[in-house]
Amino acid sequence: MSHPALTQLRALRYFDQIPALSPEQLDWLLLEDSMTKRFEQQGKNVTVTLIQEGFVSSDEVSSELPLLPKEERYWLREILLCADGEPWLAGRTVVPESTLSGPELALQTLGKTPLGRYLFTSSELTRDFIEIGRDADLWGRRSRLRLSGKPLMLTELFLPASPLY
């Protein structure tokens, strides 16, 4: 199963440099903290619509492969993050199987829990980079995060109803 927003997320093209955007837009796109928390600060009830979750082969994560270790399988989670029931963000998380050890095994059991609620409670979270991307009129970003030094990729597409626009 897929969703049109996730098709658009996979079509994002990334900028080599930070594009000329308003300070408000850059504040959203370059946010280092939890997007879930940021949405909640807007006074919204944040929920997850789970689109896909499970192991996939490297063929299904080809755009993330150059930024992750080469492995046989990856844990893929695709979601819509909704604010008061309205989709604000499409999210795609790609986790190499080798990352899924110790506490990071919890990444496989998030279900409808927002990723940010797990990631940003870890004292072992670091972010290697944020890249800003665009497809048509929508903006997005991708980050390589590390939990206890183990990598994962997070790609987010801001949907038209989100406060970015």
Swiss-Prot record:
Keywords per UniProt: Cytoplasm, Lyase, Pyruvate, Ubiquinone biosynthesis
What catalytic activity is recorded?
Answer: chorismate = 4-hydroxybenzoate + pyruvate
Q: Name one GO biological process term.
A: pyruvate biosynthetic process
Gene Ontology CC annotations of this record: cytosol
Pathway given for this chain reads: Cofactor biosynthesis; ubiquinone biosynthesis
Ranges that cross the membrane? none
The top EC class, named as a word, is lyase
A GO molecular-function annotation: chorismate lyase activity
The subcellular location is: Cytoplasm
Q: Name the InterPro entries for this protein.
A: Chorismate--pyruvate_lyase (IPR007440), Chorismate_lyase_/UTRA_dom_sf (IPR028978)
Under Enzyme Commission nomenclature, its number is 4.1.3.40
Positions of substrate binding: 35, 77, 115, 156
Can you tell which superkingdom this protein's organism belongs to? Answer: Bacteria
Its subunit composition reads: Monomer.
Protein family membership: Belongs to the UbiC family.
* PANTHER family linked: CHORISMATE PYRUVATE-LYASE
Described by its record, this protein's role is as follows:
Removes the pyruvyl group from chorismate, with concomitant aromatization of the ring, to provide 4-hydroxybenzoate (4HB) for the ubiquinone pathway.
Spell out the protein name for this chain. Answer: Chorismate pyruvate-lyase
Organism per entry: Enterobacter sp. (strain 638)
Identify the taxonomic lineage of the organism of origin.
Answer: Bacteria, Pseudomonadati, Pseudomonadota, Gammaproteobacteria, Enterobacterales
